[in-house]
Amino acid sequence: LSILFLTVLSHLGLLGKPFHVYSPSSKENTLWIVKATPKGESLKLEVAEKVKFDFSGRVITAHPRKPLLYVTATGGDPGKVPGAVVFLNKDGSYQKHQNINFNDGACYLSLDTGNRHILGVSYGNGRLNVYPLDEQGIPGKAITTIDEGKKEAHCVLLPPDGKNVYIPYVKGN
């Protein structure tokens, strides 16, 4: 499997090129931006920056076509769950971030196949929220909230055709 991974990376032209790893730290209320540089068969990791947030970010996803990251907390007051849109430079380094609010804390975020909406599911209450994205990729107020009466939603997945949404519920469901 690792040979296949290296083969794919070399065909994509990524082998040997530095890249960034992004990780929210809920304990420090920061976004860690780590520069990863391939060195032969190893990987050199160095903290490029720690971005301070006003909230405990736990969940992160990237926009597939824009240099944006979406970070959210897993809990908070309904309609005021803190999150942020992180703007990146072309090289993947940090530019700025904008605080936003979500309806519910999310344990998983996904974008629809047209990259026009971000979908979030809550582990705590099981709800799905769908937020429209404006031209810059900033989420607006939720246009749909679905509550099936089940808790512990694990993730929200969409097939390539985008015609369905799959939300597995865990534990007692």
Segments and roles (model prediction):
Residues 16-37:
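An edge-strand/N-cap motif at the start of beta-rich repeat modules
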Residues 2-11:
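Bacterial N-terminal signal peptides
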Residues 28-29, 75-79, 124-127, 171-173:
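Short glycine/acidic-enriched loop and turn motifs that connect beta-strands
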Residues 96-159:
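Asp-box/WD-like beta-propeller blade repeats and closely related beta-sheet repeat scaffolds
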Residues 17, 63-66, 113-115, 160-161:
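Residue-level detector of Asp-centered blade-edge/turn motifs that repeat once per structural unit
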